[in-house]
């Protein structure tokens, strides 16, 4: 398929999850409706991951595509119908007998993802070392956490041009080259092992305290208990605390055989979140999630959340923007050359600010223009004018004067306050 055909085929999947309730806004949101180029709901401005959208198949397709043409093809399977790679995530089901007064019942726990190791006891131990609220048990807070992190850490629009908004053929080609490069140079999947198993791993290397390396000659010099003691000295590359013998650890091949992590320490160095499904990107001695690795390589548009492959883009408020996406967050009008106000780190045009966000003057009860001076006390504001900031009793101008605030009213003296009480 040529580039022109790829561009024509692009879409954002606007029907997916349509009408799903927002878990954050509840009844305030009319239901999920994807904005035509932002990755948010048009109704409540929350992301798709904040809505009750069933994404398991879509997420499995996304991760499957990420692993395509990599050494991790054992983690994917291609559907017979369309050849689309699907992520073969490992689901773990545990059954625990529960003693009751008269009989024994079976309690079943399903983990929506578990490390793909043959030893289920090791996988179970790995899960127990994660914070409870981050264990991906089906129907739990942890499962919801995993769902959000899949969306946040591995955006589909960071690897698939068809998920982006109106890329040019040149941008499509650049993105494909970028994805190919990070797959070959940075992408990896953690492996759960017992620390002692690392003694036999690597090209004539063994792990010593503090992550130092020792050659086989040094190993050969060790004898008896001394050698065994040395082999049990492992420290976490993240927290630097020791690894307990028998506890599972995570090994990242791109980081090298001299580095191990506690399960709860295998996190992105930028956002400090657990690396979802142990999928990592390695750069300059640090672990990253997909999003923050890409952020370290390319500018990201604060409007559409996509990486910028164009040579021309704008910078405003310490953020990057496609030229066509530096728009009002409320009405989508382009802001180039226009007055705007930042509201929760989002640019809003002056008319929308006055209509939707401006504070109301306690004096005249009109919205206060963003360019006009105002007086603010607690949650109350006034135009800083002789017509508005007045004593609520005698109408004396209070600009530059002492005043007594009482529930949205202001007084110039105790006497005026008593007269209004």
From Swiss-Prot:
CDD domains: LIM1_Testin, LIM2_Testin, LIM3_Testin, PET_testin. It is found in: Cytoplasm; Cell junction, Focal adhesion. Disulfide bonds: none annotated. Residues 234-297, 299-359, 362-421 form the LIM zinc-binding domain. GO terms for molecular function: zinc ion binding. Residues 155-164 have a biased composition (Basic and acidic residues). Residues 92-199 form the PET domain. Gene3D superfamilies: Cysteine Rich Protein (2.10.110.10). InterPro entries: LIM1_Testin (IPR034958), LIM2_Testin (IPR034959), LIM3_Testin (IPR034960), PET_domain (IPR010442), PET_testin (IPR033724), Pk/Esn/Tes (IPR047120), Znf_LIM (IPR001781). Its main location: cytoplasm. GO terms for cellular component: cytoplasm; cytosol; focal adhesion; plasma membrane; protein-containing complex. GO terms for biological process: negative regulation of cell population proliferation. Keywords: Cell junction, Cytoplasm, LIM domain, Metal-binding, Repeat, Zinc. Residues 133-164 are annotated as: Disordered. Scaffold protein that may play a role in cell adhesion, cell spreading and in the reorganization of the actin cytoskeleton. Plays a role in the regulation of cell proliferation. May act as a tumor suppressor. Belongs to the prickle / espinas / testin family. The N-terminal and the C-terminal halves of the protein can associate with each other, thereby hindering interactions with ZYX. Interacts via LIM domain 1 with ZYX. Interacts (via LIM domain 3) with ENAH and VASP. Interacts with ALKBH4, talin, actin, alpha-actinin, GRIP1 and PXN. Interacts (via LIM domain 2) with ACTL7A (via N-terminus). Heterodimer with ACTL7A; the heterodimer interacts with ENAH to form a heterotrimer. This is Testin. It comes from Felis catus.
């Amino acid at each position: 398929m040529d580039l022109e055909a790829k561009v024509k085929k692009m879409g954002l999947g606007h029907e997916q999850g349509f009408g799903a309730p927002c878990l954050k806004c509840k009844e305030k949101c009319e239901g999920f409706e994807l904005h035509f180029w932002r990755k948010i709901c048009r109704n409540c401005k929350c992301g798709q991951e904040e809505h009750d959208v069933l994404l398991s198949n879509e997420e499995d397709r996304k991760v499957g595509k990420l692993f395509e043409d990599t050494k991790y093809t054992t983690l994917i399977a291609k559907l017979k119908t369309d050849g689309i790679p699907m992520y073969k995530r490992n689901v773990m089901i545990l059954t625990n007998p529960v003693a009751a007064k008269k009989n024994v019942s079976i309690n079943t726990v399903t983990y929506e993802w578990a490390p793909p190791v043959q030893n289920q006891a090791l996988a179970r131990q790995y899960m127990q070392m994660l914070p409870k609220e981050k264990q991906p048990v089906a129907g739990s807070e942890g499962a919801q956490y995993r769902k959000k992190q899949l969306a946040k850490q591995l955006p589909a629009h960071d690897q698939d041009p068809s998920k982006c908004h109106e890329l040019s053929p040149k941008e499509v080609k650049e993105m494909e080259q970028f994805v190919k490069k990070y797959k070959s140079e940075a992408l990896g999947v953690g492996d759960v092992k017992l620390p002692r198993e690392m003694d036999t791993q690597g090209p004539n290397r063994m792990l010593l305290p503090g992550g130092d390396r020792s050659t086989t000659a040094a190993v050969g010099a060790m004898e008896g208990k001394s050698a065994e003691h040395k082999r049990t000295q492992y420290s976490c590359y993240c927290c630097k605390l020791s690894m307990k013998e028998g506890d599972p650890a995570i090994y990242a091949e791109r980081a090298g055989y001299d580095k191990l992590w506690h399960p709860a320490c295998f996190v992105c160095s930028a956002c400090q979140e657990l690396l979802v499904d142990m999928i990592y990107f390695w750069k300059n001695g640090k672990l990253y999630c997909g999003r923050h690795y890409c952020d370290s390589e390319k500018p990201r548009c604060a409007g559409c959340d996509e990486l910028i492959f164009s040579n021309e883009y704008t910078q405003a408020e310490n953020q990057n923007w496609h030229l066509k996406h530096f728009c009002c967050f409320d009405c989508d009008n382009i802001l180039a050359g226009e007055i705007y106000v930042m509201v929760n780190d989002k640019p809003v045009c002056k008319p929308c600010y006055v209509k939707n966000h401006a504070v109301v003057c306690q004096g005249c009860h009109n919205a206060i223009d963003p360019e006009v001076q105002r007086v603010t006390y607690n949650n109350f504001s006034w135009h800083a004018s002789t017509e508005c900031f007045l004593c609520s009793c005698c109408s004396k101008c209070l600009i530059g004067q002492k005043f007594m605030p009482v529930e949205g009213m202001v007084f110039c003296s105790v006497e005026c306050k008593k007269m209004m009480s």
